[in-house]
Amino acid sequence: MKTYDLIVIGTGPGGYPAAIRGAQLGLKVLAVEAAEVGGVCLNVGCIPTKALLHAAETVHHLKGAEGFGLKAKPELDLKKLGAWRDGVVKKLTGGVAGLLKGNKVELLRGFARFKGPREIEVNGETYGAQSFIIATGSEPMPLKGFPFGEDVWDSTRALRVEEGIPKRLLVIGGGAVGLELGQIYHRLGSEVTLIEYMPEILPAGDRETAALLRKALEKEGLKVRTGTKAVGYEKKQDGLHVLLEAAQGGSQEEIVVDKILVAVGRRPRTEGLGLEKAGVKVDERGFIQVNARMETSAPGVYAIGDVARPPLLAHKAMKEGLVAAENAAGKNALFDFQVPSVVYTGPEWAGVGLTEEEARKAGYNVKVGKFPFSASGRALTLGGAEGLIKVVGDAETDLLLGVFVVGPQAGELIAEATLALEMGATVSDLGLTIHPHPTLSEGLMEAAEALHKQAIHILNR
């Protein structure tokens, strides 16, 4: 039996950084991968989706460029688009494999299953280690009455735009995945209807900024319906007849589409891992139970990323992987749960920390500052004046509690807010920081000043 200091099961955005960090700290590391290096995010998630979003955004901007004197009628070659998307993925997966090799991490292809607390089996061979990190990720959640297939897509199938753009598309799910893919297909020519069971899209996010995103999407032409569920569908000659119903029951309506995209969430991928043989416990939803050190119920076994707990985000998985690897090497690392979220629509949405509602429930005396992008010179020059930046703070201590953005490049802007929260900054700290002009980042400074009714470029009310 070959033995190692650390075995990492899965090489996604949590697994490969964990393996590299373990090797950096002097551990003998084996990384086991059942599919493709880079995991869901790199191969069939974050990266290919963002590539398609960029292409769709370019098409959208060209169609609207006449306003500043550019007349263009873009013609899209879907096969070339698919090849470009795959090229981006291939370059990055090759880079990850090179990083593993360069850090002397041994890579083994195959499916790993636990044989006991300190042993796994891969391809019929047994491997042992002092520590294990489970980083097996997640898979699309199915929806009753909508089995995945030719007519009902999951998020992975939806990436294959080169196979054709449906004339009419129903997207079930108003979270990040549904919104991003829905807008991609809308901008590439589909008539898109998006439904969400909850009263608003992005139900876990800030309500005000989520409502502004919905308004922007509807203005662009997407049909967004909340408080709605899909009951079932029937395939007929003229398309897929889908029965929709109010979320709380009652009124029903039938719509006809050509394809259905189910994006109602993801579930942890643990089937066949033999967790019970290792003594690893899962919760009622199937997520592996972990503490702040990423330790499971089994000594020496860690779990990270989507398989461990929400939110299911690549950057969260990466940080958790580093924490787990450092603890496997004898350090005392803890996971700080200041995790930003981004939706890469146009306009983008991003948030970190507590929403207004969450802060009030937590007992804070909440104050809010807002700065609209319509007052931002840089936003206007980019043609993206929709949306705002919202700062949530505690009136008594001035402690920064949360920041939410809907507007251009929100995903880039939220990084500064995340750093501020991680450092325990006050709202005044953001306002006192000199920001370059003209930039979108000035809006964060102005929103912080607006909380104290001292913003310069809007009237303080």
UniProtKB/Swiss-Prot annotation:
| Signal peptide, first to last residue | none
Temperature effect, per record, is: Optimum temperature is 65 degrees Celsius.
Which residue spans traverse the membrane? none
Provide the residue positions that the database annotates as binding NAD(+).
G173, G174, G175, A176, V177, E196, A263, V264, G265, R266
What does this protein do, in the record's words? Has chromate reductase activity.
**Which locations, inside or outside the cell, does it occupy?**
Membrane
Recorded family membership: Belongs to the class-I pyridine nucleotide-disulfide oxidoreductase family.
Per UniProt, which keywords does this protein have? Disulfide bond, FAD, Flavoprotein, Membrane, NAD, Oxidoreductase, Redox-active center
Give the pH dependence of activity as annotated.
Optimum pH is 6.5.
This protein's name: Dihydrolipoyl dehydrogenase
Q: Which GO CC terms are listed, alphabetically? A: membrane
